[in-house]
Curated annotation (Swiss-Prot):
Statement: the UniProt record of this protein carries the keyword Transmembrane helix: yes
Lineage: Bacteria, Pseudomonadati, Pseudomonadota, Gammaproteobacteria, Enterobacterales
Record function comment: Proton-coupled chloride transporter. Functions as antiport system and exchanges two chloride ions for 1 proton. Probably acts as an electrical shunt for an outwardly-directed proton pump that is linked to amino acid decarboxylation, as part of the extreme acid resistance (XAR) response.
Places the protein is found: Cell inner membrane
Protein name: H(+)/Cl(-) exchange transporter ClcA
GO molecular function: antiporter activity; voltage-gated chloride channel activity
HAMAP family per record: CLC_ClcA
């Protein structure tokens, strides 16, 4: 009797193929999979840190304003308490930065860009506590700073921390988790996941190494950080300006003019920031005592303004819906714009731990609203709404200053939930970016990073000369 050998060979061959496939999977390099898993861990931690930072800033601001209520009957005492509360909080932030982690000063975004190029160190064990608590002091004191700078730098440092703790090896893992943390930090700061992704791809395009693994990791990190944010803050737009009307096609040329205005102002604003940095450095001369006292004076000034003219202090998120609704006169808009330009320059250029995204969004809103009010008066036949120009202006200053128009556009759309205004926003942002580029202005973060690297090189050269001199003696 013959045996049916082919029927027995087929299952055996299938089992051999399965075993070979399993062996190949086990022998394959696990680094890409590990990076993606760690990206989820980084995104989760960054989201939780951003929520804690946001809640902490809000709590400090509420406590500070609550302390003023007890002195409401005594106006001189009220002003004194307003100044001192903000000054003390600001001095705390300045002291932490100067004493323990100077790289935690300012926005922190240029530091992440430098780290992605392996030109700046990432000392997460110092930067994380200093940036977190120092930022609580300066932002809680009412200084004109944004929360996105701290969350981006905290996010990048969390990425490096996770890398070190789990001992992942290789340049790809180090670079990818650093970028993932930064993107997750921006997404959690503004509840804007797509803007967080575009921020890495567009703003950090010279430093970001685009690979399938790196971009997937950024996506995963941003998703997890946004989920963490929405668990604690609900799924609502960060800035509630209501649903604005669409912009008719025959009015789009006005948005191009608005973009040209921002294209002129953006490079000028960048020069003012760098010039103010030089001026304030001459004031304190690198002395920690003078620097902390100077920071306390700036913080105290913001505290006074927060009581006397609230629209001129703070990050600006409370100002944006009020300005967009048209609740300010033209004269008041001009005053707010000038005052916020001055306070933004003082706060950001002094090296306080805090970002500049939010203050620039507020400045763009105020200038856009003022332009819209003029357009409404000059062209009544168009039935214009000044608020649409305010929304277009929000992202235009970002586009002109840091040269990231896509990030600015998507960020504003996600924050305000007015997607019908995407066309006028593109026109405004494109006009602002092109003119700023043609005038030769350098992107703000690139200019700050170049200064930091030049200072670092000078310090290294001075140390090497001192070491050589000591050896010769």
């Amino acid at each position: 009797m013959k045996t049916d050998t082919p029927s027995l060979e087929i299952p055996q061959a299938a089992r051999l193929r399965r075993r070979q496939l399993i062996r190949q999977l086990l022998e394959r390099d696990k680094t890409p999979l590990a990076i993606l898993f760690m990206a989820a861990v980084v995104g989760t931690l960054v989201g939780l840190a951003a929520v804690a930072f946001d809640k902490g800033v809000s709590w400090l601001q509420n406590q500070r304003m609550g302390a003023l209520v007890h002195t409401a009957d005594n106006y001189p005492l009220l002003l004194t308490v307003a100044f001192l509360c903000s000054a003390v909080l600001a001095m705390f932030g300045y002291f932490l930065v100067r004493k323990y982690a100077p790289e935690a000063g300012g926005s922190g975004i240029p530091e992440i860009e430098g780290a992605l190029e392996d030109q700046r160190p990432v000392r997460w064990w110092r930067v994380l506590p200093v940036k977190f608590f120092g930022g609580l002091g300066t932002l809680g004191g009412g200084m004109v700073l944004g929360r996105e700078g701290p969350t981006v730098q905290i996010g990048g440092n969390i990425g490096r921390m996770v890398l070190d703790i789990f001992r992942l090896k290789g340049d790809e893992a180090r670079h990818t988790l650093l970028a993932t943390g930064a993107a997750a930090g921006l997404a959690a700061a503004f509840n804007a996941p797509l803007a967080g992704i575009l921020f890495i791809i567009e703003e950090m395009r010279p430093q970001f190494r685009y690979t399938l693994i790196s971009i997937k990791a950024v996506f995963i990190g941003v998703i997890m950080s946004t989920i963490m944010y929405r668990i604690f803050n609900h799924e609502v737009a960060l800035i509630d300006v209501g649903k604005l009307s669409d912009a008719p096609l025959n009015t789009l040329w006005l948005y191009l003019i608005l973009g040209i205005i921002f294209g002129i102002f953006g490079p000028i604003f960048n020069k003012w920031v760098l010039g103010m940095q030089d001026l304030l450095h001459r004031v304190h001369g690198g002395n920690i005592t003078k620097w902390v006292i100077m920071g306390g004076a700036i913080g105290g000034l913001c505290g006074l303004l927060g009581f006397v003219a609230p629209a001129t202090s703070g990050g600006g998120f409370n100002l944006i819906p009020i300005a967009t609704a048209g609740n300010f006169s033209m004269g008041m808009l001009v005053f707010i714009f000038v005052a916020r330009v001055i306070t933004t320059l003082l706060c950001f250029s002094s090296g306080a731990p805090g970002g500049i995204f939010a203050p620039m969004l507020a400045l763009g809103t105020v200038l856009g609203t003022a332009f819209g009010m003029v357009a409404v008066e000059l062209f009544p036949q168009y039935h214009l709404e000044a608020g649409t120009f305010a929304i277009a202006g929000m992202g235009a200053l970002l586009a002109a200053s840091i040269r990231a128009p896509l990030t600015g556009i998507i960020l504003v759309l996600e924050m305000t939930d007015n997607y019908q205004l995407i066309l006028p926003m593109i026109i405004t942002g494109l006009g602002a970016t092109l003119l700023a580029q043609f005038t030769g202005g350098k992107p703000l973060y690139s200019a700050i990073l170049a200064r930091t690297l030049a200072k670092q090189e000078a310090e290294q050269l001075a140390r090497s000369k001192a070491a050589s001199a000591s050896e010769n003696t």
